[in-house]
């Protein structure tokens, strides 16, 4: 895990989104609030 609650609240570098599973990425699977994105989400989540 790289980010979010699984990584002690870390944020992703380069404004990447943090997925519900604690990984950084830029696709909808990482960024969509409906997929429980944790940080830097699309839609201001």
Curated annotation (Swiss-Prot):
The keyword Lipid metabolism is annotated on this UniProt entry: no
Function: N-acetyl-D-glucosamine / N-acetyl-D-neuraminic acid binding lectin. Can inhibit fungal growth.
Signal peptide: none
MF (Gene Ontology): chitin binding
Matching Gene3D superfamilies: Endochitinase-like
Keyword Disulfide bond among record annotations: yes
Domain Chitin-binding type-1 intervals: 1-43
Keyword entries, A-Z: Chitin-binding, Disulfide bond
Source organism of this protein record: Hevea brasiliensis
Cysteine pairings via disulfide bonds: 3-18, 12-24, 17-31, 37-41
Coiled coil (residue ranges): none
Pfam family of the protein (one): Chitin_bind_1
Protein name per its UniProtKB record: Pseudo-hevein
């Amino acid at each position: 895990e790289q980010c979010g609650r699984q990584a002690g609240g870390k944020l992703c570098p380069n404004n990447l989104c943090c997925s519900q599973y604690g990984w950084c990425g830029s696709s909808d699977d990482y960024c969509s609030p409906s997929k429980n994105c944790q940080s830097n989400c699309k839609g201001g989540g």
